[in-house]
């Protein structure tokens, strides 16, 4: 049975993983006949957002501990991710992907990526194993695959431009579409960059996961 490593970035769209995307992805992996295991960096979040009001809260939360909520405890430090034990990689979106895995939300095209997250993602790229990135997470793709790699975040002009400045070649997609860069074996879909509800987000995520598991 194929195994997919899933890297989470916290719990909650504004400061961590987009929960709908993460759960849809885990469900789709199982539905496609594969298994999953979650990972996250053992670091503090950039900040904590009150998801009721949108206000920043004066507290500190750990990305790994928060991500464990989504994974029901079935999670490890991303520093322990061994590419040899998995067939594919998947990164859901949410602002945590751009605040905790990288600092794209702060630095844009000049962003940097967490060391252990970079090591894990590059290990899959170097091994030629497929990877899928959802929502805002595709902004990580140029940091891993380099000049000319293709990906989509939907059709947001500013984010697409940043993707290009980082060395990527952005491809506009609708919410129910996926883009597959066959040369680099990497998939992406807009998810909640465009989705207005769960079912719309699911339309692209399920297609991406089906393809990911098929080519793994």
Regions found by a protein language model. Name each.
Residues 1-8, 12-18, 47-57:
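Accessory recognition modules or surfaces
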Residues 5-37, 74-216:
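Active-site-adjacent pocket-lining segments in enzyme domains
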Residues 58-74, 79-82:
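Glycine/small-residue-rich loop that forms an oxyanion/phosphate-binding "nest" at active or ligand-binding sites
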């Amino acid at each position: 049975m194929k195994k997919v490593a899933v890297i989470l970035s916290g719990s909650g769209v504004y400061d961590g993983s987009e929960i709908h995307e993460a759960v849809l992805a885990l469900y789709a992996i199982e539905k496609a006949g594969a298994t999953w295991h979650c990972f996250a960096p053992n670091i503090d979040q950039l900040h904590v957002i009150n998801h009721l009001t949108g206000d920043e809260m004066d507290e500190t939360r750990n990305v790994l501990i928060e991500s464990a909520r989504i994974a029901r405890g079935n999670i490890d430090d991303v520093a322990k991710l061994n590419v040899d034990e998995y067939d594919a990689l998947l990164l859901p979106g949410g602002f945590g992907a751009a605040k905790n895995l990288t600092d794209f939300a702060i630095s844009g095209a000049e962003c940097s990526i967490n060391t252990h997250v970079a090591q894990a993602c590059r290990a899959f790229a170097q091994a030629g194993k497929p990877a899928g990135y959802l929502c805002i997470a595709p902004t990580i793709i140029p940091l891993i695959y380099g000049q000319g790699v293709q990906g989509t975040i939907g059709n947001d002009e500013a984010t697409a431009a940043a993707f290009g400045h980082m060395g990527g070649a952005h491809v506009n997609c609708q919410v129910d579409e996926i883009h597959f860069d066959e040369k680099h074996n990497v998939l992406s879909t807009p998810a909640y960059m465009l989705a207005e509800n769960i079912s719309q987000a699911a339309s692209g995520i399920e297609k991406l996961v089906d393809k990911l598991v098929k080519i793994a």
